[in-house]
C-alpha cells in the first residue's frame, strides 16, 4: 500500500490527509509507515506551527487493513534456518512499524490538530489520542476492538488514550471493546468540539475540513506567536516522554506475544472472510 496520504503546506499550517476511501482509510504496515514519514517531514518545516491530520470520505480510519494479515505461524524458520515460530517476521513487521508510528506521533513537535471526519478504529484511534486538539463530526465514534481481536493495547493507547478519555470510559473502550460515540467523546474532553451543523451529506468531509481550518485560523492563527506555541507544547509534553518511551516498548512486546500465539491472526482472518463482524 502506497500513496495513501497527501501533505499540503498552507503557510503556518500543514495538512496531512489520509485518502484510502475504498478501504474506509484502513492502513497496512506500509500505510502507517507512510503516515509516519509525513509527520516527520512536516516536523522539519520551520515555517509550520500547526499540523492538521484528517481524512477523505465518511471514515477517518478503520484501523489496520485486516486483508493483509498473514496466516498464523507455527514452526516457521528465520533466514538462518532457526525455528522461531515466526518471531523474526513479527519483530521486523509489527514490532518495528508500531514502535515507529507511535513514536512519530508522541514526538511530533508541531501543534497537532486531528479532524475526525468520521469513525476512528484500532491503532488509528490510539494514535489520535496524542493530538493537542481534536475536532469531530456527529457521525464520529471511537472503537478500540483489541480485546475482541485477541490483541492488547497498542499505539500508546494504554497511556495516551486513558489520559485523554479518562480511566472509566477508557476501560469501556479498551477492555470491553465498546464503541464511544461523538457526544461521549465531547463530554469526556477527548474531542474539543463537534461540528453539529454537519448533517451527513456526501461532501461533509470537504465541508468539515473547511470548518476545522477556519477554527485553526481563528484559535491558533497569526495572533499567537508560533515559537511560543511550540515551546509551550514541548514543556507540557516533556514529563510524559520517558513514560511513553517505556510504554511503547511494553505494548509492542506484549503484542508480539499475542501474535506468536496465533490468536489475533485467526480473528483477523475471520473478519476478512466475513465469518466475524465487529460492530462497525
UniProtKB/Swiss-Prot annotation:
E.C. code: 5.3.3.21
An annotated Gene Ontology molecular function: delta(3)-delta(2)-enoyl-CoA isomerase activity
SUPFAM superfamilies: ClpP/crotonase
Keywords: Cytoplasm, Isomerase, Peroxisome, Virulence
GO biological process: fatty acid beta-oxidation
Keyword check for Isomerase: yes
Protein's pathway: Lipid metabolism; fatty acid beta-oxidation
Motif Peroxisome targeting signal (PTS1) in this chain: 278-280
Family designation: Belongs to the enoyl-CoA hydratase/isomerase family.
Protein name, UniProt field: Delta(3,5)-Delta(2,4)-dienoyl-CoA isomerase
Amino acid at each position: 500500500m502506497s500513496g495513501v496520504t497527501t501533505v499540503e503546506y498552507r503557510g503556518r499550517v500543514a495538512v496531512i490527509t489520509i485518502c484510502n476511501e475504498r478501504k474506509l482509510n484502513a492502513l497496512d504496515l506500509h500505510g502507517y509507515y507512510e503516515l509516519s514519514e509525513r509527520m516527520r517531514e512536516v516536523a522539519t518545516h520551520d515555517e509550520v506551527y500547526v499540523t492538521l491530520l484528517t481524512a477523505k470520505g465518511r471514515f477517518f480510519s478503520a484501523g489496520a487493513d485486516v486483508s493483509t494479515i498473514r496466516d498464523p505461524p507455527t514452526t516457521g524458520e528465520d533466514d538462518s534456518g532457526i525455528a522461531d515460530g515466526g518471531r523474526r517476521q513479527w519483530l521486523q513487521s509489527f514490532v518495528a512499524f508500531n514502535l515507529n508510528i507511535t513514536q512519530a506521533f508522541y514526538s511530533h513537535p508541531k501543534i497537532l490538530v486531528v479532524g475526525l471526519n468520521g469513525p476512528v478504529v484500532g491503532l488509528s484511534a490510539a494514535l489520535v489520542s496524542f493530538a493537542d486538539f481534536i475536532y469531530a463530526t456527529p457521525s464520529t465514534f471511537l472503537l478500540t476492538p483489541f480485546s475482541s481481536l485477541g490483541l492488547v493495547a497498542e499505539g500508546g493507547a494504554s497511556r495516551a488514550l486513558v489520559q485523554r478519555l479518562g480511566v472509566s470510559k477508557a476501560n469501556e473502550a479498551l477492555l470491553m471493546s465498546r464503541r464511544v460515540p461523538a457526544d461521549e467523546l465531547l463530554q469526556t474532553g477527548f474531542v474539543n468540539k463537534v461540528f453539529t451543523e454537519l448533517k451527513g451529506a456526501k461532501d461533509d468531509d470537504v465541508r468539515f475540513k473547511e470548518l476545522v481550518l477556519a477554527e485553526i485560523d481563528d484559535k491558533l492563527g497569526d495572533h499567537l506567536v508560533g515559537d511560543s506555541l511550540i515551546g509551550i507544547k514541548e514543556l507540557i509534553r516533556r514529563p510524559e516522554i520517558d513514560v511513553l518511551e517505556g510504554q511503547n516498548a511494553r505494548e509492542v512486546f506484549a503484542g508480539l506475544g499475542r501474535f506468536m500465539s496465533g490468536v489475533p491472526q485467526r480473528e483477523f482472518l475471520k473478519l476478512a472472510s466475513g465469518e466475524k463482524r465487529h460492530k462497525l
